[in-house]
Amino acid sequence: MDIPFYSFETFDWKTIPKEKHMGETGFATWQVLQLENIRVRIVEYSANYKADHWCKKGHIIHCLEGEMNTELEDGRFKKLSKGMTYFVGDESDAHRSSSTIGCKLFIVD
């Protein structure tokens, strides 16, 4: 990740609109800040959410609430719970997220 020169700024997430994205099951709600080439998001997965696609984009994901499950294309499964963080590079490991109980995530990509 290349973070270009960017003056100090703060954001109040309460002012960022929410976008609803349907999954294979359930839905995700995104709040998005685009800062040059860096996307910063608060994402909430509903209970019983499952992504409708495999993702090959790199992310840094921190779980703020709940639990998220990640299925990797090679068959591995990883669980991310409150206070945990994961990272994956662009084109590294195709992955697909789901959540049984719902979760709230802070994501940088």
Q: Which residue ranges define each predicted feature?
A:
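A short, N-terminal "cap"/entry segment at the start of jelly-roll beta-barrel domains
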Residues: M1-R41
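Conserved short histidine dyad/triad with adjacent acidic residue
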Residues: E36-C55, G89-S92
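Short beta-strand segments in beta-sandwich/barrel cores
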Residues: K50, E67-E71, T85
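Short histidine-centered beta-strand/loop micro-motifs
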Residues: K50-C55, L72, S97-S98
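Short, conserved beta-strand element in jelly-roll/cupin
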Residues: W54-T70
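Short acidic-glycine-tyrosine-enriched beta hairpin
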Residues: D74-E91
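Ligand-binding loop in jelly-roll beta-barrel domains
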Residues: D90-D109
